[in-house]
Regions:
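Perimembrane helix-loop-helix junctions
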Residues: 4, 200-210, 227, 239-272, ...
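Transmembrane-helix signature of polytopic, membrane-embedded enzymes
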Residues: 18-22, 102-124, 128, 152-174, ...
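Short helix- or helix-capping micro-motifs
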Residues: 26-28, 168-173, 200, 227-231
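Short acidic/glycine- and proline-prone juxtamembrane loop motifs at membrane-interface regions
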Residues: 42-43, 177-191, 357-361
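Interfacial juxtamembrane loops and adjacent helix segments
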Residues: 57-140
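Hydrophobic, aromatic-rich transmembrane alpha-helices
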Residues: 147, 152, 249-252, 313-342, ...
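Membrane-interface transmembrane helices that cradle and orient dolichyl/undecaprenyl
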Residues: 157-159, 198-220, 230, 333, ...
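Membrane-lumen/periplasm interface segments of specific transmembrane helices
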Residues: 262-298, 317-318, 400-410
Length: 411
């Protein structure tokens, strides 16, 4: 009897581990909502809203330029995501205005007595007519932060078990640096999601290549999409994730190393198509993406010193020091699952973009938390597991308290 193919799909389970992870992500989103509810619209918000809306509603509105902000040469996906909720909300309100009395219409400016729109309404004109503009601007980035947290938990739980997953996710959800990146329109949280997801998807593809070919395709499609997010967040993120991922794939796929290069090349080529779509199939506008200064990279200890010297990150700092001591002193902690994220963190933390604004140290943070989760999980399974669990719980509580204490500073 032939089995229906949908019956072979792994069933999603929402048991206690998933509920705990969902609770932590809920606390993460609650902190983001609290910050957002107390913020005010800034010039940066207006720029992302204006340019993002133009990409959806009227690209090329200014002759010779992709948007009135000029030709976006880096981070086009952030503009797209910032403008999408506003454009959708405006479209919905215009639809409802058809059934409203003229004096009750939400979108008042630029409409004739017959309801025809004469011109595109600016974000400044809409600031009092569309509710929750500030929240709509931040929803995509809060969503990206929650998705990165879910991916972090999924990776660490599969590698290290429940304790490793809880440790990494708790430190992530109470990280002021991550919250700060999620409560303002910017490409950094998107790049962090792409770099972390891309490298671990590369490792997943390499493992799948040991099995039948039918398991390759969905992972390669996912890898292509993640590479697309990388190149449209920061151009430099694509070669970084491709090269690091390629190195790990060659490490893992011992018997199929000859097929690793075509897989990475296909995913990278597909990401360029994704970027072309984000630029509205405008080759001229996309040409500004490939500028030399977009891929200039330098190295300095300043980003790491600034992060670890912050009092709000004291819990992560102490956890990092403890994890490094255990990694160097305990043989069982030195294996691929712990070494890979440590190498990524050591490479990305001192990296600095010199041609464009960027924060590669933020891209390194999920790898650092993965490393901490793995080493702590090993310690909790050792001979002094009770002491290790008590120490880990104390550090998580410390980081949570410091994060909540620092929330007003993120406004």
């Amino acid at each position: 009897m032939k089995t229906h193919r949908f019956s072979r799909i792994r069933r999603f389970r929402f048991n206690l581990p998933q509920r705990i992870a969902a609770g932590l992500l809920f606390l993460f989103l609650a902190q983001g909502m609290w910050i957002t509810s107390r913020q005010k619209l800034s010039d940066n918000d207006y720029q992302y809203a204006r340019c993002g809306r133009e990409m959806w509603e009227s690209p090329g509105a200014v002759a010779g330029y992709f948007t009135s902000c000029g030709n976006i040469h880096d981070g086009v996906l952030a503009y797209r995501l910032a403008g999408l909720p506003l454009s959708v909300n405006l479209l919905v309100e215009r639809g409802f205005d058809v059934f409203r009395k003229p004096e009750d219409r939400v979108v008042q400016v630029g409409a004739t007595p017959t309801g025809a729109v004469l011109r595109t309404l600016s974000t400044w004109e809409l600031r009092h007519q569309l509710t929750h503009i500030l929240l709509l601007l931040r929803l995509p980035f809060l969503g990206a932060g929650a998705l990165l947290g879910a991916g972090l938990w999924w990776v660490t739980r599969r590698l290290y078990g429940n304790l490793g997953g809880y440790t990494a996710l708790a430190l992530y959800c109470f990280s002021p640096a991550v919250l700060s990146a999620c409560v303002t329109p910017n490409p950094e949280i998107l790049a962090s999601l792409a770099v972390y997801g891309g490298i671990y998807t590369c490792i997943g593809v390499a493992h799948a290549m040991q099995g039948p070919r039918r398991k390759w395709r969905p992972r390669i499609v996912l890898l292509t999409a993640i590479f697309g997010v990388a190149v449209t967040s920061h151009l430099i993120a694509l070669p970084l994730v491709a090269l690091i991922g390629l190195g790990f794939m060659l490490w893992v796929a011992e018997e199929r190393r000859g097929q690793v290069f075509p897989v990475v090349a296909i995913a990278a080529g597909g990401s360029i198509v994704f970027a072309l779509v984000c630029y509205g199939f405008s080759a001229n506008a996309m040409g500004f993406l490939f500028r030399a200064q977009n891929v200039l990279l330098n190295f300095s200890a300043e980003p790491a010193l600034r992060f670890f010297s912050s009092f709000a990150n004291a819990g992560v700092t102490v956890a990092t020091a403890a994890a490094l001591v255990l990694y160097c002193g305990v043989r069982r902690s030195r294996y691929f699952g712990n070494t890979a994220p440590l190498l990524c963190a050591l490479l990305l933390f001192p990296s600095m973009l010199t041609g464009v604004a960027g924060s590669p140290w933020l891209w390194a943070l999920p790898f650092l938390l993965t490393f901490i989760g793995g080493v702590f999980a090993d310690a909790c399974e050792g001979p002094k597991s009770r002491w290790a669990m008590a120490a880990a719980g104390s550090l998580l509580l410390l980081q949570a308290v410091l994060c909540l204490r620092s929330l007003p500073e993120l406004l």
